[in-house]
């Protein structure tokens, strides 16, 4: 019997069970937990390979018979729900049908009945590549239309947030007419969008038009007034119409302190933006909401991970972001009250212990949209370096539990908080085929390929006038799925059910499908996969030190991070 060494097998078919792969230049190792492949019957495409008629392709098995539209074979899958496994990914009608062993069951062993390949099946070999779900940014300020291009190039396939462009402070898509224009503009990109309206009203009637107009949820922001009456009203409407409320609390504590806000919330579910506080929120103790079972906490990437530059860059960013005047002492005090090294350091640890469940960008509202994914992995690597391997790890040398915890922050948990996890957030069967392929050396920073709705929309591409598409310069460029009517067919907009019932898509002439969110009002912190910790968090009002279950949370800022200047020129 012919044999291969592990090294030879990995070079031809990708790593198998027990092998480990380093993620970029981080300290993280992903160890293969299970391999769906059947040795000797692996799928490979190309000259002299197995995916030929009568071999890996089943003769006469066409689309109507269930043949896959697209096969991604021999992929190392990193998924918060499925785990870290090796297998073939089957795509049909823009959705994932199964993960397992693909091919021709007439001559191959172990072929999954839904992963049969035929003449209609296009193939992307993924041996040596990592596949993840498309990223979800839960905290976007749409101040610039061009951020969509940066998002796709970074591996984000769903953007949720507000703003209408370069207005004074871009917070939300308030107003039925305004959100309609954003939905019409969203037709231009192969990206899923969810637009947030303005929840700052103590009168419930004024909120419903935004939901009928196409908003996914509502956002309460301190710049419009985050008073207890506003919070209570918005949550009452949310409970009736099933949408998520995002809360950016009152930094100045003018309308009440944290205790007053929590009293207004009661035991109702709410999505807490800026859990750490540098981006906004009750100073200095907003971070304690990460220990509440009904508060779903997220934070944003400017403070993650904590570095020697974090404190200095935030003061200027806050002044610009919130339309503050550096010549007005009260405005300067507002900015300075937000930036606390103690809570920023604690934020890193609360992410690592799973107490903060989600990480978004706060794009152009102090964050950077192209750094959602890379900063998540920078933080995970920093925490491994400073805190060691997690005690709950079960593999021989991998960091799988930590990896699953961190990828969940911008995939499945980001989807669950908005009630859209039945559509996106993982590579589970039945979900939209939104996925990203990475070369391990570039994992988390530069994707190799972005697949949206089962079709390639962005990819590393060489000179198009050259003889091969691998000829330099290699640049991330839009591909066929990003043009014509394909971009609308491959993506969706997430809305409240009122917009679907009002047939808003027809009224606005939209080609993108509108999909309703549901199940947001029964969520608890326990629904946040790998990130459901609820420690008792206390902030010392004098020193700003943060304590979780009585233990002081502290970590040092770092002067170097992975996935940085080794890859980028800035």
Curated annotation (Swiss-Prot):
GO MF annotation: an example = urease activity
Q: Which organism is it from?
A: Pseudomonas syringae pv. syringae (strain B728a)
Annotated Urease domain residues: 134-570
Q: How does the record describe its quaternary structure?
A: May form a heterohexamer of 3 UreC (alpha) and 3 UreAB (gamma/beta) subunits. May also form a heterotrimer of UreA (gamma), UreB (beta) and UreC (alpha) subunits. Three heterotrimers associate to form the active enzyme.
Q: How is the cofactor bound?
A: Binds 2 nickel ions per subunit.
Q: Locate the residues binding Ni(2+) 2.
A: 219, 248, 274
Q: Which family does it belong to?
A: Belongs to the metallo-dependent hydrolases superfamily. Urease alpha subunit family.
Q: What is this protein called?
A: Urease subunit alpha 1
Reaction(s) catalysed by this chain, per the record, are: urea + 2 H2O + H(+) = hydrogencarbonate + 2 NH4(+)
NCBIfam families attached to this UniProt entry: PRK13207.1, urease_alph
InterPro entries documented for this protein = Amidohydro-rel, Metal-dep_hydrolase_composite, Metal_Hydrolase, Urease_alpha_N_dom, Urease_alpha_subunit, Urease_AS, Urease_asu, Urease_asu_c
Give the positions the UniProt entry annotates as the active site: 322 (proton donor)
Q: In which pathway does it act?
A: Nitrogen metabolism; urea degradation; CO(2) and NH(3) from urea (urease route): step 1/1
- Keyword Transport assigned: no
Annotated binding of Ni(2+) 1, by residue: 139, 141, 219, 362
PTM summary: Carboxylation allows a single lysine to coordinate two nickel ions.
**Gene Ontology cellular-component annotations:** cytoplasm
What CDD domains does this protein's entry cite?
Urease_alpha
According to its UniProt entry, the protein's GO biological process terms are: urea catabolic process
Q: According to the lineage, what is the superkingdom?
A: Bacteria
Listed Gene3D superfamilies: Metal-dependent hydrolases, Urease, subunit C, domain 1
The compartments listed are:
Cytoplasm
